[in-house]
Amino acid sequence: LEYHIEQGDKLDNADLDVGVVSGIVSVIRYEVTAKGMSNHAGTTMMVNRKDALVGMAKLIVAAEQRARELSDTLVFTVGKIAVSPGQENVIPGQAVANFEMRHMDKAVTDQFYADIQALAKEIPNCEFEFVNTSAKYSTPCDPRLIKLIDDVCTEKGISHIIMPSGAGHD
């Protein structure tokens, strides 16, 4: 049994002392590649551009919005983007980003991934490729241990909530 500080803001926002961990969330990662067409930035008219970075940006915004709609406990992060060729006077022909999603329920992450793929198909002037780079699925905690900690907190008057660990390593 480990005591651990919360690395998020859920307990602070709710003004609670303790989070009783119900399980460790899934952490699913994809490398997403947007393919457009590199061309000269000054001579290619806007109507003819196939900018991979613009396509990736549209997908990220759409995915972030979908994550908020799908579940209030689903989290979605893009922490890394690489653009090629990476020159300020060249329209990006390729953008590669790392998409990460976390949730306790595999059905939610599966649905979210399917939704992202569908959203990608709606974005013009780009083709998208998805490669799963990591899949660590959720692990529920022993219900007897959860109940024991919950009961002790209640008995001692310690404000608490039963919640999943979003950090993925507790």
Regions inferred by a protein language model and the residue ranges of each:
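Extended hydrophobic-aromatic, low-complexity segments
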Residues: 90, 108-112, 161-162
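Short, solvent-exposed loop/turn segments at secondary-structure boundaries
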Residues: 44-47, 111, 140-141
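Short amphipathic alpha-helices in soluble, non-transmembrane regions
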Residues: 112-120
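An extended, acidic, His-containing surface patch that forms the Zn2+-binding/catalytic region
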Residues: 129-170
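Midchain, well-structured core segments that form catalytic/ion-binding scaffolds
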Residues: 1-107, 134
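Short secondary-structure junctions
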Residues: 67-76, 123-127, 153-158
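Charged helix-capping and loop-helix junction motifs
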Residues: 17, 116-117, 144-147
